[in-house]
Amino acid sequence: MKNYIIGFLVFLFAGILVGCGDDNEKEIEESSEQKVEITEAEKVDETDIVAVVNGDDIKGETYNLVYSQLKLHAGAFEEEVDNNEIKQATMESLIDRQLLLQQAKEEGIEITEEVVNSEFETIKSENKEALETLLEQYQITENGFKDQLKFELTLNEFLAKTIEVTVTDEEVEEQYEKAKEGNDSIPEFEEIKDQLKKQLLQQKTDEALQAKIDKVKEKSEIEEKI
C-alpha cells in the first residue's frame, strides 16, 4: 500500500496541474478512464469525526476525499484493490497530514485564503480542462481541491523552512550504476544525471520529512474513531 502514497498525501493536485502541458493532460485523460467503483458503504458521513490528533478533529469529508484519491490511484496500478488496505492507508495519510499541519503552525507558517484563492484562479485559468477532468475523476469539488492546494502550499513552506538535504555527485553516479544494472537501454549518464539528482533529492526529502513526523507522532495523542 505504501507504493500508492506520494509523501503522505495521495496526490498534490496542483503539482500535477501547474505547468501542465500536452503530455500531462494526456496522462490525466488516460487515467480518468480507469473504472474503480467507490460505493456509498465505503464512505462515512461528512460530519463524522474519523480521528482526533492532539485535540484536532479530522472529519468524514476529508476522509472521503483522501479515500477516493487513494483508491482511484491504486486502481490504476492494481487489478484488484483491497478496501481495507485503502482504509488503513487513508487513516495513516490523514494523521500524518494533520501532524504536519500542526508542526507548520508551530513554525509560524500560515497560508491565507487569499493566497489559496489566487493560486487556484491561476491554475484554473491556465489549465481549465485538465482541472475539470481531475475534479471529475477524483470526485471532488473546487473547495475540496482548494483544501488540498492549501495543504500543498503549507507543505512546501514547511519543507523550505525545516528540512535541508544534499546529494553528492558520488551518490548520483552510484544511483546511475544501480539503474544501469541489467538495463542496456539506459541513456548515457550525462543525459540523465540532473533527473537522477532530482529523484535523490526528493527521496531524501521524503525520508527526512517522514522521520520528523514519526518522531512527533511518538509523543502525540491520536485516537482513531473508525
What are the roles of these predicted feature ranges?
Residues 115-129, 174-188, 221:
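Short, mixed-charge aromatic SLiMs
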Residues 106-108, 113, 185-188, 211, ...:
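Surface-exposed patches in mature extracellular/periplasmic domains of secreted proteins
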Residues 130-138, 184-198:
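Charged/polar, low-hydrophobicity segments characteristic of intrinsically disordered regions
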Residues 8-13, 77, 120, 145, ...:
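Phenylalanine-focused residue identity feature
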Residues 71, 85-104, 115, 140-141, ...:
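Solvent-exposed aromatic/hydrophobic patches embedded in short alpha-helical segments
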Residues 76, 129, 164-168, 185, ...:
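Charged, solvent-exposed alpha-helical segments that act as regulatory interaction surfaces
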Residues 1-82, 178-181, 191-226:
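Short, low-structural-confidence N-terminal segments
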